[in-house]
Amino acid sequence: MIDDISSNYNIDSERVYASGYSNGAMMAYGLANYKNNLITAIASVSGAMLDCAGNLSRPVPVIHLHGTTDGVIPFNGNSDYNSVQSTLDYWINFNNTSVNPIINTYSDQGLNIEHYLYDNGDNNVSIEHYKYIDGGHEWFINSFQGQNTSELVWNFLSKYNINGLID
């Protein structure tokens, strides 16, 4: 798909991002694992990473947003899906980020949101996790410090090119 699009349109091959909701988020994680040479950074909303054994050659920045009461893809995982924390731990370890996050909390329309930043990874990549307390399986409409989910995702992804954080 990337080859087809790039043959018909002028794209910046150093800034190819994958994002998705639910099953689309699983695809984004799969692309990060199996097409690591093409995908710059990924965003997962209410998704999970399946067990992967990709051939990773470079760090991949990840933003993950998930509700703690998601009844479709449980926050704590189950026999079908990895937990959010095990997914984050995979990328924290691979990207060599800090293991102790910077944590901020925020409330919007009665929903509490915890933001975890794991920074200082290889190539200056980071992992960001937005934990929506009592949030369900959704593309969240609540804002975090004035940014909705789409803005959070884009503002995270667009900070990176294939070589890491853009100066």
Language-model features and meaning:
Residues 1-23, 33-34:
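Gly/Ser-rich "nucleophile elbow"/oxyanion-hole loop immediately N-terminal to the catalytic nucleophile
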Residues 10-12, 34-35, 54-58, 119-126, ...:
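Extracellular/periplasmic catalytic domains that process cell-envelope and extracellular macromolecules
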Residues 27-31:
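Hydrolases whose catalytic domains are alpha/beta-hydrolase-1, hotdog thioesterase
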Residues 37-48, 61:
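A conserved short beta-strand
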Residues 70-73, 137-139:
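Acidic catalytic loop of the alpha/beta-hydrolase fold
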